[in-house]
């Protein structure tokens, strides 16, 4: 039901704002985002796509792994959260603890700010996600290489 409602909302949404250079999408129905009928040609941002390995609402394959493997090598990243599902990747409501995704999201945003104008997608774009320092002590996070997603 949520994905069906999302289709109507996203078809009216303009994702081509040239001011946006990097975005984070957690467990999105990527097939809708990558659909050329909704403005893929106008997407000017690098994408950090995060998916839980046990997400039954938006399964990582075909919603994340397949589309990521087919995407151009423009500096996008796919991070899989081992054991993550659609509901345990967010910060616990009312608790002072942070989400398991806070470090990786912060690293991505910091990388985008540090890259400045060169943060835009492209084959020679600088890496926005450092090789380490963004993991979680409670859940394994894996940066999946494009080549591995193509399998």
What does each of the following model-derived ranges do?
Residues 17-18, 38-44, 70-73:
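Short, conserved loop/helix-junction motifs that constitute active-site signature segments
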Residues 24-27, 50, 81-82:
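Alpha/beta-hydrolase-fold catalytic nucleophile elbow
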Residues 30-32, 54-58, 86:
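Acidic catalytic loop of the alpha/beta-hydrolase fold
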Residues 36-38, 59-69:
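Short alpha-helix in the alpha/beta-hydrolase fold that links the catalytic acid
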Residues 43, 49-51:
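Short beta-strand/loop motif that positions the catalytic acidic residue
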Residues 70-87:
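Catalytic histidine neighborhood in serine/cysteine hydrolases
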């Amino acid at each position: 039901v949520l994905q069906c409602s999302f289709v109507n909302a996203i078809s009216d949404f303009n994702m081509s704002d040239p001011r946006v250079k990097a975005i984070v999408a957690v467990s999105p129905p990527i097939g809708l985002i990558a659909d050329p009928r909704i403005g893929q040609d106008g997407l000017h941002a690098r994408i950090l796509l995060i998916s839980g390995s046990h997400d039954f609402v938006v399964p990582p394959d075909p919603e994340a792994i397949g589309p990521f493997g087919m995407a151009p090598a423009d500096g996008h990243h796919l991070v899989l959260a081992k054991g993550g599902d659609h509901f345990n990747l967010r910060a616990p409501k009312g608790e002072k603890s942070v989400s398991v995704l806070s470090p990786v999201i912060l690293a991505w945003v910091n990388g985008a700010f540090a890259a400045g104008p060169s943060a835009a997608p492209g084959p020679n774009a600088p890496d926005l996600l450092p090789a380490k320092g963004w993991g979680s002590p409670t859940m394994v996070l894996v940066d999946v290489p494009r080549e591995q997603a193509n399998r």
